[in-house]
Swiss-Prot record:
Catalytic activity line of the entry: (2R)-2,3-dihydroxy-3-methylbutanoate = 3-methyl-2-oxobutanoate + H2O; (2R,3R)-2,3-dihydroxy-3-methylpentanoate = (S)-3-methyl-2-oxopentanoate + H2O
Protein family: Belongs to the IlvD/Edd family.
Superkingdom of the organism of origin: Bacteria
Binding site for Mg(2+): 81, 123-124, 491
Name recorded for this polypeptide: Dihydroxy-acid dehydratase
Cofactor or coenzyme needed: [2Fe-2S] cluster; Mg(2+)
Species the sequence originates in: Nitrobacter hamburgensis (strain DSM 10229 / NCIMB 13809 / X14)
InterPro entries: Dihydro-acid_dehy_C, DihydroxyA_deHydtase, DiOHA_6PGluconate_deHydtase_CS, ILV_EDD_C, ILV_EDD_N, IlvD/EDD_N
Pfam families documented for this protein: ILV_EDD_C (PF24877), ILVD_EDD_N (PF00920)
Enzyme Commission number(s) from the entry: 4.2.1.9
Amino acid sequence: MPAYRSRTSTHGRNMAGARGLWRATGMKNEDFGKPIIAVVNSFTQFVPGHVHLKDLGQLVAREIEKAGGVAKEFNTIAVDDGIAMGHDGMLYSLPSREIIADSVEYMVNAHCADAMVCISNCDKITPGMLMAALRLNVPAVFVSGGPMESGKVNVNGKIRSVDLIDAMVAAADDSVSDADVEAIERSACPTCGSCSGMFTANSMNCLTEALGLALPGNGSVLATHADRKGLFVEAGHLIVDLARRYYEQDDARVLPRAIASFKAFENAMTLDISMGGSTNTVLHLLAAAYEGEVPFTMKDIDRLSRRVPVLCKVAPSVVDVHLEDVHRAGGIMGILGELDRAGLIDSSLPTVHSTSLKDGLERWDIKRTKSDSVRSFYLAAPGGVRTQVAFSQDKRFEELDADRSSGCIRDAEHAFSKDGGLAVLYGNIARDGCIVKTAGVDDSILTFSGPARIFESQDAAVDAILTNRIQPGDVVLIRYEGPRGGPGMQEMLYPTSYLKSKGLGKQCALITDGRFSGGSSGLSIGHVSPEAAEGGAIGLVEEGDRIVFDIPNRKVHLDVSDAELERRRAAMEAKGDKAWKPAPRKRRVTMALKAYAAHATSAALGAVRVVKD
């Protein structure tokens, strides 16, 4: 039977000094035999998804102590991708994921914590904590800050839901007046919480439910709604129970690696594909799998994408549908319920809250539950009040959206499309694959070809789009923006938003070894692997080369002969230390970013760092 890790620093004569320090934090004699639970918070006033988390760590801590544990809180960093977007700040976003994972490892291992509750929310924080949980493999429960309410704006006399992306698109559209841009800007992000669409933050918080590491509702109940408080209260009690089961009953089934198994990663990716989640989720799931030594790869994602239909479409893939609407339709357990009925997931797997996912679905799927309290839970509605206060609203919808033929969540028979919302493309320009969010691609451009317009930075591409140098039919190619080449693999939200604002969203393609925001849509192909800085063929494309996209057949092809590509590769290699580097660009790469770039891998491996022994 495993001993409590914390006893390393709380038991024995030689630990008198450590116990003295523990006492200085408030611990008493009777606490030294209890499980020490790390409350891993990520409060910051920089990020709307995290501004309300300050008191929530202590809420969880109080519940842990009521349940018989000892709670010790610490904080991680948290980068707001939206605020960091469009300038060199975005270079730090993806590397911050690794810093978060490392900081959790440092704190939990340095202080011999027995288990942890991870309070995350936004883009890199949930993935970073997930990587840490699988790396450490101590009992863990995830509870996020929750999505913000969608904004509401009057458009031609009609109230429409809006979000961050609407503000960006409107600002770049010369036909929209300054007054209208300001109205959308002021309305787009009305409350605390992660941005209201199926962007990266919400996608990842939804996937923690499918992995089995979070409570039902984690991905969908609003940050402002009183019902969300129950998740934090329950997480505090649950983690003490999980710790006791492992350390006192030798029940290893409660450990993250036992719960987030290969089959659980398949379930999570199946959910992701079915709801058209952010392409960044591919990157983060691969990274988490790497940390947990789970052999889940791009090949598995490709396989799943060919058989999973789209059962739910949310902004930015469609307008006027946000996480509050998904919640009203039964949330993530509602989508998982439909996937289970279609035989597309394995519901026999354990979760932190139920013996099996199937048991959880019996209670939490609105199509099968007999619980009035569960039905009431999924009626939680936006309050419509601008606020940064968690749990401050208590409005409810009058009825659930249980329409599976034309509602927010569909059954397999009435799927939005039989093909999934994400796809892996392969070809001579992306030997190890690249990713496209098919849920955001118009049917008219599922097959597309055009001449490459080459840019060796996001900034150069943005300038070309805004100065009308991109024409209908062009393929905007942005390279040397991968994990190593950027470094940091910037998100390309501004180029995709500006293409849309210029009326080119359905007339152009964009391909890059960088990545896209969860708010991106259109024919946007990212994560090209290998990246240019690693000698990938994307670094050999020349201005005007034709690139062919065939999403139905999962292909992307640079229309250049193998012999010509070999000639270009030889010419590139002949440049010596200047080979596989971008044209000069204004970019300050600090020592911290250089350290990340030195060990970063391409997107096909999740852009994780690999440090050889």
